[in-house]
Amino acid sequence: MRVIDSKISAMITKGLNKEKFDRKLSKRDRVVSDGHGKVRVILWKTEIAVLDAQTDEIIVKNGGFESVTTKSRINSLLSEWAQGNPGISQRKWVWYIDEVCPLTRDRKSKEFQGLAAFPLKVWR
């Protein structure tokens, strides 16, 4: 895990524990918490993830930017916070959501439409 990813993850933990803040971690990364368990991760000026402690859900979105940095941040968030170890891969300029079937352990891919929701891992 890269340093910025671990900083983002630490701020998410604080936000899910209902601490309110608006923290700029680098010139392009920002984490905002509303103090009620909802945390937003922002890359440049685009929201790429929303984690909600009340619904136990993580929603990831690319905001229309399919860049290496966006994919890297989303994959880091998914590996740390989403159940089932989903990830984003790219083949021939198309992004795919890769999920592991819990029964067969087969990896299944479907095209990423710019927004996807997953249940949160147990984080408390």
Language model features with spans:
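Terminal leader/tail segments of proteins
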Residues: M1-R124
